Amino acid sequence: MKTYLEIQVPLRYDAAWFDELRCGCQHTGIKWQTGFYHITMVFVDKTPTDVDLRPLLEKYLNRYSAPTLTFDKLDAFTTMSGMHIIYLTATEIPMSFLSLIEDIRSDMKDAGCIIDSPFRLHVTLGRIKASVIQLASVQEMTKKVSLPAFSLTLEDVDYRVFRGETIYEIKLKV
């Protein structure tokens, strides 16, 4: 089964920069995400059914403090499935956060999980089929937005079945 570990990002849909982005992309057909903003720390393409990953997650997450990330860039990329993803990211990622993610990913692989995609820090804001508009056009629209750098502390982590129930959740200490 497919599973993923995500850390929630408390974004506001009505933030001025997000309104500006949506206005600048009107009439494109972009489907905007209206909530449940998160960073996928690990997407597991195949999770062994006989392995309980909760102890592995607890080993790392019980002692890890909530990271504060400064978001300062909007951009877009194209997925293997042919969707353009409009996203928010941080150009400087704390090393402790990257190390945590790499350690968890490594231990999950050692436990028999198949993880095909590398980590890419992004918060999905919207999606559109690549056949509708060129990536360069979407990227040009994101560059026109006045995005002030802002910092958020990320506390809530969920491990879930892809498009399914939550297996494990924790609130990181602040």
Predicted features and spans:
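Basic, often amphipathic N-terminal segments
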Residues: 1-71, 93-147, 166-174
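Short histidine-centered catalytic/ligand-binding loop motif
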Residues: 84-93
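Acidic/polar active-site rim loop that often engages polyanionic ligands
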Residues: 81-82, 118
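Extracellular/lumenal ectodomain signal focusing on beta-strand-rich modules
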Residues: 71-73, 156
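Internal active-site segments that recognize and position negatively charged phosphoryl groups
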Residues: 151
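Glycine-rich beta-strand-turn "strand-cap" elements at beta-sheet edges
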Residues: 79, 154-166
